[in-house]
Amino acid sequence: AIEVGLIERFTPSASHSSLMLATMDERQSPGPISRWLSTAQPEALFVLSAVAQYIGAALAVLLFDQVEPQTVAWFRVMGAGTVLLVISRGWWREWTREQLVGVALFGITTALMNIFFYLAIDRIDLGKGVTIEFIGPILVAACTTRSVRNGVALAFAIVGVVVLGGVEVDNNLAGLVFILIASALWALYIVFGARVAHVDRGVAGLGLGLVIGTIATAPIGAPWSGPVWVSPLLLGLCLLVGVFSNAVGYGIDQFTLRRIPIRRFSLLLALLPVTASLVGWIALDQRPSTIDVIGIALVLIGVAMQERDEIERVERVVQTDPA
């Protein structure tokens, strides 16, 4: 009941979403990239987002020998927030207090999620970490599933994730605790992110949120940042992680959340453990077993089965003076 109430409180209704989308159509003249992101199949967007996020994560793992994981995550958030604000025109104008609170909650949640995720994958495999972290999105999907078909699809995804994740994390209790915290924060990321996505700011809400998150989590990431500031190579690589994982990955999420309900979004996130396993195999030589492949297949079946509903777009109605 608590989860459902939280989701309903912070998730825009279908009518509100449609109204916001209509307002966005009226105010904005999107470029070709925005038009493509607004019309491409959500499954394709998720794969693209996942590839970007886990290329960044694989690069981050390689940096952990030289920089503390929480510091890499902090620079990731900082770099992405800075880039997104630079490319967002007029991001500082016309924010309401309610919108700013929502953006701040989203940004702080995202920053903490990144930090705990990196602390976890410093201790456990990338693919298994993402799979266990998927518990959060599964809870969101379960709380928002209303049809039998979607329930069956969710069941396939859950079983696939359990199979893919396995039952062991190399007896690393700290890694398990960190990834479970990241999982809870991922659930909040979906709920708060859906709210921010429907604010008429392109990716400015994401950028501003990440800057706020950077400031809020400075006590966690900044104390170990000395080696990064004095090494242009390390600084550039840390910021590159942010561009791949947050600016590109989360930016695509914002476009997707404007188009589909969070129930479908949460289940489509099952593609991320699959992609993480493949990226871990290619980039980090973390090879999936036969059982892992079975888990991947079950996830893909669940994703294919679910209803492909989208948030209805409303055409702008212009009322003329009869006189």
Predicted regions and their residues:
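Alpha-helical transmembrane segments of compact multi-pass small-molecule transporters, enriched
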Residues: M78-V83, I132-C143, I212-A216, R264, ...
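C-terminal-most transmembrane helix of multi-pass membrane proteins
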Residues: L21, D25-P32, V77, A270-A323
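Hydrophobic core positions of alpha-helical segments in small-molecule transporters
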Residues: L48, F75, F106, I132, ...
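Hydrophobic alpha-helical transmembrane segments of multi-pass integral membrane proteins
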Residues: Q41-L45, T71-V86, N150-F156, A174-I181, ...
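Hydrophobic/aromatic residues within transmembrane alpha-helices
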Residues: L63, V72, R76, A120, ...
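Hydrophobic transmembrane alpha-helices of multi-pass small-molecule transport proteins
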Residues: L84, I135, R149-E168, V211, ...
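Hydrophobic alpha-helical transmembrane segments of multi-pass membrane transport proteins
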Residues: L48-I55, L59, I87, A104-L119, ...
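Glycine-/small-residue-enriched transmembrane alpha-helix faces in small-molecule transporters
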Residues: E3-W74, L105-I108, L112-F116, V159-V162, ...
